């Protein structure tokens, strides 16, 4: 039986709408983790498809400066993986949450304990950007009987056979990395990006979402045309931190019709 995240996103896709997933850094709020529910409900009220929630880490190899700085602010507020898990247990939302974490915090917490502790929360997906596909067995057995999907990341340099290997049996969605490098580097796209995404979309039987560097209205239109939706991180994180208006951008993304 498909997991909740898969069913939710497939329903949006079937309705002919673009999927929109914003990224936020847990604890990057003037109230620290006490402000997490407020941010989640703000995004939920705007109609987002799911919400990616980052766990701060001191060595975030895939993060650009905006998200790296957000992680440092979160750590300065005292955010820990344990405290985040306890906070997530108290948050009620109909929107699926997807945890984005490097493997080290997960390893320190204990993968089995982490999954068990999140069993009754809104967390329905897990992204581990520094976990190679060959080491997915460190995590997958603990997710097998849960409603949490392990999300595969597929980079631009991935050939068709490798793509098939990475996404075989995957749940939730495929995270298509739009740029070579860290998050937030908008516009630095390869010439064959659209071809790559169309190819990936053809071999995947779950939604394909494009992320890394997506930040403009033009990006929304481009990537919704060749994939099932977008993930936006740095633009959202920066706006929330600086108190900049972001509602119109989110509403445009949520309302995108195929």
From Swiss-Prot:
Metabolic or biological pathway, per its Swiss-Prot or TrEMBL entry: Amino-acid biosynthesis; L-tryptophan biosynthesis; L-tryptophan from chorismate: step 5/5
Active-site residues from the entry: 52, 63
Gene3D superfamilies hit by this protein: Aldolase class I
Cellular compartments per GO CC: cytosol
E.C. number(s) listed in UniProt: 4.2.1.20
Pfam families: Trp_syntA
HAMAP family linked: Trp_synth_alpha
Protein name: Tryptophan synthase alpha chain
